[in-house]
């Protein structure tokens, strides 16, 4: 899906967008053309290989620190699997760089007029507070609540959060 950007274009300084000599983004070491529109995010770098072994073909493999990436096709659909490492800090770095790969023209260092929307799917482990959910059960979450405060640093936090769900969770847990 393409989303039209109504803002004026500013040049993003090198201190805010670090591009490596090979044209890749700083932490992930990916170039824009190596990114699929569907991205599976896993925490553990070892899980990247577990997911990618189901790909029909592999277009690229890129590894830097805890960030391992494979882009290929699964059932004819192009997708990327990326390890984020542990913690919200690493996830923030990963998602910020994915957005830059999708929506910044690296040559002039400006946001693209037409926005590219990525589909991010988090695949990993989780805890649960419901007694009927047992260790090893498979779950599909439609929403989540973060208590790390990260979204407070982003414009429009309340527009993307389910405030009713947050309030109900706090009330239920006594936080």
What are these regions (language model features)?
Residues 2-175:
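Metabolite-binding pocket within alpha/beta catalytic cores that recognizes anionic/polar moieties
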């Amino acid at each position: 899906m393409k989303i039209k950007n109504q803002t004026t274009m500013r040049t993003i300084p090198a201190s805010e967008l670090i591009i490596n000599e090979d044209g890749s983004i700083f932490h992930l070491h990916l170039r824009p053309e190596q990114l699929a529109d569907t991205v599976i995010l896993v925490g553990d770098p070892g899980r990247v290989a577990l997911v990618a072994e189901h790909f029909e073909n592999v277009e690229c493999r890129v590894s830097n620190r805890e960030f391992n990436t494979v882009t290929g096709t699964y059932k004819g659909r192009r997708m990327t699997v990326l390890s984020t490492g542990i913690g919200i800090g690493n996830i923030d770095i990963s998602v910020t760089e994915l957005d830059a790969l999708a929506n910044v023209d690296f040559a002039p260092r400006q946001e693209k007029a037409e926005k590219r929307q990525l589909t991010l799917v988090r695949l990993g482990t989780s805890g649960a507070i419901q007694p009927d959910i047992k260790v090893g059960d498979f779950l599909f979450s439609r929403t989540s609540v973060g208590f790390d405060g990260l979204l407070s640093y982003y414009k429009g936090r309340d527009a993307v959060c389910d405030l009713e769900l947050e309030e109900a969770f706090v009330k239920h847990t006594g936080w």
